[in-house]
Amino acid sequence: SDAKSATIYSSWHKNSSTFIDGLIGYGYMENDLTRIVQANPSNPLTGNRGVKQYFTSIKFNKIRDKDNFTSLLFGRFDYGLSKLKSFSESGNAHALRFEEQDLKNKSISFGALTKYKKKIKKGYFLPYGRIEFFENLTPDSEAKTSYVSDPNTTYNYTVKEDYSNSLKLELGFDLNLIDSWYFATSIRRLIKNNKDFENEFAIKVSKPF
């Protein structure tokens, strides 16, 4: 594949605690595709498809420090549009033609994080908690295809997201020691509205040298 892209980024802050970041971009990609059909595996199907991509993202952060507590409120909006060009395969009698297709990706998320900073004998102990809600606003997309040998019969396939929103919960702590050792651990649970979920436990240890 061959890809080119350009992005413009800007950051604005009203004061030292409120930040808004945004970017907008465009990309173009050429993909060389190969498909093998079980009925004729010795003659693979090949094709080339171009994709134009438009995308933007806006992020908001508000930080508040009070005593040993740091609170962060955040939100984000993402939008992307991929315009897939039509193309035809070649190679054998099972070759397909794919029509133009638009793939839209749209989502919004917001949440909060609270961290407590406690000085200990050899450094700092920083426990934290985080909650984030994610709403997937991506619409369905329809793919249309036909056999090159039979262009009058069209087959449709609807591309759907498997869930529309999720809730992420995270607890953890960082341990920064004066002798440069750094420890971090966290446990995270992602709950999706389709009754699916993911659990993650992470440990990180580092020391510069």
Task: Report the location of each language-model feature.
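Membrane translocator/pore-forming domains, dominated by Gram-negative outer-membrane beta-barrels
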Residues: 1-209
